[in-house]
């Protein structure tokens, strides 16, 4: 390993390791479920997941994602309690980060270390040992199309990264009592996160460029052939953009809804909603996950830890 690679490695979080035995994998899973439940203040992650899907069965079927003006905290809580996604305008566009260009980002923050997803990360999106490449942000922004990815592979993608230098340039609304740190998603047209769901409420801010997002309600998971990546993250092999109903016949019963997010948009994705995200242009996005009982379940006292 080169000196530069060692230096970058020390500035980035360690890569996850695979369990060496089934027993170790089971023990890790149990410990992770307990940690996740404690952080969210719920009696059980499994019970929370089932409650999310149960609530979703009572919701109307969406044919489009509502676009509304920004809400104050009280208005957001009331709307989000329905358990349906919606998009807000008039908030993110005021962030200082939105005024920066890619050139500005390179000049001011190019020395930040980043970790890019490389190879065919779309087919193996949530595998713990999927290929990654560490580099400086400036190096990533300077990449030429096709330089480090092969034919048929998507472009390298800086996804789900903590870029702490950028946090002061984003003014997140105080919609939740507790939230995880901001995560950043940077990449050219064609970068993608395949269909999956997080069992945490999610705020997704679009900084630059446009992205196409498909959303599917939580209770349609029975049609999506889900795979558990961790207790609060499930992936699906089904692609709503290019549906293969021969391989996934049950997916005919799923009802995805599409939305295009543009610079300045803030999308609320309720816990448990499946979503697939593809960049239509060179894009920068940021998101934060809430760390608590989903707003749609606030009145379900049986889920709260004593």
Please report, for each region that a protein language model flagged, where it lies by residue.
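N-terminal accessory scaffold of Fe(II)-dependent oxygenases
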Residues: 1-266, 274-306
């Amino acid at each position: 390993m080169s000196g530069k690679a060692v230096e970058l490695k020390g500035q980035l979080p360690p890569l996850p390791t695979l369990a060496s035995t089934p027993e170790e994998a089971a023990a890790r899973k149990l410990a992770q479920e307990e940690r996740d439940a404690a952080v969210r203040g719920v009696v059980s992650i499994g019970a929370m997941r089932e409650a999310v899907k149960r609530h979703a069965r009572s919701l109307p079927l969406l044919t489009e994602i509502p676009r509304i003006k920004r809400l104050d905290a009280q208005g957001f809580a009331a709307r989000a309690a329905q358990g349906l996604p919606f998009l807000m305008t008039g908030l993110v566009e005021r962030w200082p980060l939105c005024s920066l260009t890619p050139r500005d980002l390179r000049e001011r923050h190019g020395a930040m270390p980043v970790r890019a997803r490389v190879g065919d990360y779309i087919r193996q999106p949530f595998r713990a040992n999927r290929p990654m490449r560490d580099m400086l942000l400036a190096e990533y922004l300077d990449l030429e199309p096709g330089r480090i990815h092969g034919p048929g592979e998507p472009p390298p993608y800086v996804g789900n990264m903590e870029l702490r230098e950028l946090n002061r340039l984003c003014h997140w609304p105080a919609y939740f009592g507790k939230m995880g740190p901001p995560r950043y998603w940077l990449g050219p047209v064609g970068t993608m996160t395949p269909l999956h769901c997080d069992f945490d409420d999610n705020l997704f801010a679009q900084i630059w460029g446009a992205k196409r997002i498909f959303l599917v309600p939580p209770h349609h998971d029975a049609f999506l052939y889900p795979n558990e990546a961790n207790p609060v993250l499930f992936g699906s092999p089904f692609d709503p953009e290019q549906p293969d109903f021969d391989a996934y016949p049950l997916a005919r019963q799923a009802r995805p809804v599409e939305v295009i997010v543009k610079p300045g948009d803030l999308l609320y994705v309720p816990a448990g909603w499946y979503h697939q995200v593809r960049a239509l242009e060179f894009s920068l996005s940021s998101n934060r996950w809430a760390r608590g009982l989903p707003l749609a379940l606030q009145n379900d006292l049986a889920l709260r830890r004593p």
